[in-house]
Swiss-Prot record:
<dbReference type="GO" id="GO:0006145">
    <property type="term" value="P:purine nucleobase catabolic process"/>
</dbReference>
<dbReference type="GO" id="GO:0008270">
    <property type="term" value="F:zinc ion binding"/>
</dbReference>
<feature type="binding site">
    <location>
        <position position="93"/>
    </location>
    <ligand>
        <name>substrate</name>
    </ligand>
</feature>
<comment type="subunit">
    <text>Homodimer.</text>
</comment>
<dbReference type="InterPro" id="IPR004722">
    <property type="entry name" value="DHOase"/>
</dbReference>
<feature type="binding site">
    <location>
        <position position="178"/>
    </location>
    <ligand>
        <name>Zn(2+) 2</name>
    </ligand>
</feature>
<dbReference type="GO" id="GO:0004151">
    <property type="term" value="F:dihydroorotase activity"/>
</dbReference>
<dbReference type="Pfam" id="PF01979">
    <property type="entry name" value="Amidohydro_1"/>
</dbReference>
<comment type="pathway">
    <text>Pyrimidine metabolism; UMP biosynthesis via de novo pathway; (S)-dihydroorotate from bicarbonate: step 3/3.</text>
</comment>
<protein>
    <recommendedName>
        <fullName>Dihydroorotase</fullName>
        <ecNumber>3.5.2.3</ecNumber>
    </recommendedName>
</protein>
<dbReference type="InterPro" id="IPR050138">
    <property type="entry name" value="DHOase/Allantoinase_Hydrolase"/>
</dbReference>
<feature type="binding site">
    <location>
        <position position="308"/>
    </location>
    <ligand>
        <name>substrate</name>
    </ligand>
</feature>
<dbReference type="GO" id="GO:0005737">
    <property type="term" value="C:cytoplasm"/>
</dbReference>
<keyword id="KW-0378">Hydrolase</keyword>
<feature type="binding site">
    <location>
        <position position="151"/>
    </location>
    <ligand>
        <name>Zn(2+) 2</name>
    </ligand>
</feature>
<comment type="similarity">
    <text>Belongs to the metallo-dependent hydrolases superfamily. DHOase family. Class I DHOase subfamily.</text>
</comment>
<keyword id="KW-0479">Metal-binding</keyword>
Amino acid sequence: MSYLIKNGWILNENGEKTQADIRVTGETITAIGKLDATDNETVIDAKGLLVSPGFVDLHVHFREPGGEKKETIETGAKAAARGGYTTVAAMPNTRPVPDTKEQMEWVQNRIKETSCVRVLPYASITIRQIGDEMTNFEALKEAGAFAFTDDGVGIQTAGMMYEAMKRAAAIDKAIVAHCEDNSLIYGGSVHEGTFSKANGLNGIPSVCESVHIARDVLLAEAANCHYHVCHISTKESVRVVRDAKKAGIRVTAEVSPHHLLLCDEDIPGLDTNYKMNPPLRSPEDRAALIEGLLDGTIDFIATDHAPHTEEEKNTEMKLAPFGIVGLETAFPLLYTHFVKNGSWSLKQLIDYMTIKPCEAFGLPYGTLQTGQAADITLIDLEKEAVIDKETFLSKGKNTPFNGISCTGWPVATIAAGKLAYEEGRLVK
């Protein structure tokens, strides 16, 4: 299939708007400039639209196998495409866990059969993600593992993490860490702070996260391993990562949209759609995350898309599962709250969602260039709409942003040269 995207505008390296047409042939961008349509290609009229590299999210939970009531690879991929994402990386906290070559091959086949976007599967660090026995990294890499993580739980012993880092470094793969010391959770369901004290809830202290990061950056230095911090959430964690980068340690970090947008003081009542892990932290933590993203301490934005059923979330705060969905709302929320008000440039936001995650992990995506993968998102920066969870393509409706009005919405997504999502008014 061939497409010609006409009349749109792109951002150049300086963040300036430039009008350009883009030709897609097969899975590849084959021309950029002022182009005329040929008889054998489909024209997409992008007049008034930003033509962006497809978004990249290196932290999603698609729940399959074992959690299909919450999400599947197919429904998660559709949600990603609607949100403008063309590449996502799926976490391994499924049942069963992708901890063997055979299970990883099953996941890869399922992706090929059902996904409309590129899905990169993580493999687990430990068997069944219970932290006491290492998986076969070499076999899992051969089966297509993107990187290694036990996301959902932290690796509790330094010895296990150090061994994992040495094995990962030997095969040029990253260790991706959910940073949480179980001895410091204290049965908490929210941040230890204003909200927990006001509502009589056990709180999770900031040091629960930062102490693991402090341990792990030293282990990563010793192992010469690429160490990536998931969903960083505290000012202390930002400080540790900043210092580690200054020391030349191979550490990268991501931050979620919800930690950039909300803090614990924003939680209304006991709404479990505001319960995620790590929890919403203090206003000071939120400010440190924004500063860390802007100064390069934090490398990119990832949603930590974590769908649950409404039945699971419809309970008291201490019993509800952690997690919210984010793929279909990330760009409009961030554009509205940071770009529209002048805090960030449009190019900064686009980079945090495209080239930056690719640079962090050496992926050949995230740009609009001739010869590169045809991963393209068309965005209507003038479109205003209210977030409505009932329109989500994800099975998960667990969002704290339902009813929020946002400007700037993806309206079409091309993933590897195939039209993965469109609103129905663009193709001629």
